[in-house]
A protein has these predicted regions:
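N-terminal charged helix/coil linker that caps or initiates catalytic domains
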Residues: 1-17
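Short glycine-rich, Thr/Ser-proximal phosphate-binding strand/loop in the N-terminal lobe
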Residues: 16, 20-54, 95, 175, ...
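Short glycine-aspartate micro-motif
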Residues: 16-20, 77-81, 146-150, 156-158
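Short, acidic, Ser/Thr-enriched surface-loop or helix-capping motifs
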Residues: 32, 90, 160
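Glycine/GP-enriched mid-protein hinge/lid loop-to-helix segment characteristic of carbohydrate kinases
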Residues: 40-42, 49-54, 114-117, 122-127, ...
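Glycine-rich phosphate-binding loop and adjoining helix at the ATP-binding site
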Residues: 46-59, 63, 67-145, 273-285
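Adenine-nucleotide phosphate-binding core of ATP-dependent small-molecule kinases
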Residues: 52-70, 191-197, 202-263, 267-273, ...
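Glycine-rich phosphate-binding/hydrolytic loop that grips phosphoryl groups
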Residues: 122-136, 273-325
């Protein structure tokens, strides 16, 4: 169902098939360069499946999405844009082995998607794609030196330096969730790293540990976040603890690089001040920085559209950059 194309059409109305991949769910969107989403489709991620099986299921759902857009007489996409969890090397197009996709072994994600869809593919890690979405659509003004954090499935950092997103061979940079906790007091017995407390899964484990009788055994992250937004004191207590632990563990990073802005991304950006205040207070106390010395800390302003715009951002940034050259 994809147009044969050897080069990206140089017009202002490129249509994009956006794919947001993590170990829990996959989001497909049909959008354009302005970030307008016409259709979306979401399904559970076959993260435990081998890579060929993953590609087959992804292709099947993409066909379903495009059948819907074709019924609306929308053009076929010109490019594919991908945000993917794990260690994706944007230079080689290879996803390395990671806990997110346990059966993947140095898989050629970009070339395989190009082969499947016969379209140019632009891809980034979730954290880097999130940073690009902020640069394109965020209400943050001009970004030059900044941190962007994403929290699902694990805590990951994107570093923006002089307006350029940092990449390293193998795409292992930014795995800040692997930081060892400085203290395990009042934490689950097996909590050893930042991922065990401040990632989406870590937050769920912390909530069950702190108040096991308050939550359903199958508590899901959206339900926990909504409880915090509804001012549930048990949820707020857990958020406060996790955010404070996260903030104090940024001390060395902030002192070393002194970013102008620190942006909290998906999904904890939805918590607003419930996450920002304890995080900021803890970072200020741990670092000794305050007032004008501390980086500006803010939540992404993209709201519930963040995953959709994250999916589109790698292609939009690449296409805009090509036209400016």
């Amino acid at each position: 169902m994809f147009r044969k194309a050897n080069a990206v059409p140089q017009n202002t109305s490129n249509h994009i098939l956006g794919i947001n991949i993590d170990s829990q769910r996959i989001l497909l969107v049909y959008g354009n360069l302005s970030g307008l989403i016409s259709e979306r489709l979401e399904f559970a991620s076959p993260s435990s499946a081998p890579f060929p099986a993953f590609l087959s299921e992804l292709s099947s759902h993409a066909d379903r999405l495009l059948m819907i857009t074709q019924a609306q007489r929308l053009p076929l996409p010109d490019v594919v844009s991908v945000s993917v969890a794990g260690n994706y090397d944007a230079k080689t197009g290879v996803v390395g082995s990671s806990l997110e996709f346990v059966q993947w072994r140095a898989e050629s994600l970009r070339s395989q998607l190009e082969l499947r869809f016969n379209l140019p593919v632009y891809a980034e890690t979730k954290a880097n794609a999130g940073m690009l979405a902020e640069m394109l659509f965020g209400a943050t003004g001009s970004l030059s030196n900044a941190f962007y954090f994403t929290f699902t499935p694990r805590v990951r950092l994107s570093l923006l330096s002089e307006g350029q997103v940092y990449h390293n061979p193998g795409a292992t940079a930014g795995s800040i969730g692997k930081l060892r906790l400085s203290s395990s007091e009042n934490l689950p017995e097996k909590a050893q790293t930042l991922n065990d407390v401040a990632s989406g899964l870590g937050l769920l484990r912390l909530a069950q540990f702190r108040h096991p009788t308050h939550w359903d055994p199958d508590l899901q992250l959206p339900d926990l976040l909504q409880s915090a937004l509804d001012r549930d004191p048990f949820a707020l207590e857990v958020i406060d603890q996790a955010a404070a632990i996260f903030g104090c563990h940024l001390e060395c990073l902030v002192h070393s690089l002194r970013p102008e802005k620190i942006i909290i991304g998906h999904p904890f950006h939805l918590l607003g001040e419930a996450w920002l205040k304890p995080m900021t207070d803890a970072l200020s106390q741990a670092s000794g920085l305050g007032g004008g010395e501390l980086s500006q800390i803010q939540a992404s302003a993209l709201g519930s559209r963040q995953p959709e715009l994250e999916a589109l951002a790698p292609a939009i940034m690449a296409l805009r950059g090509a036209r400016e050259r």
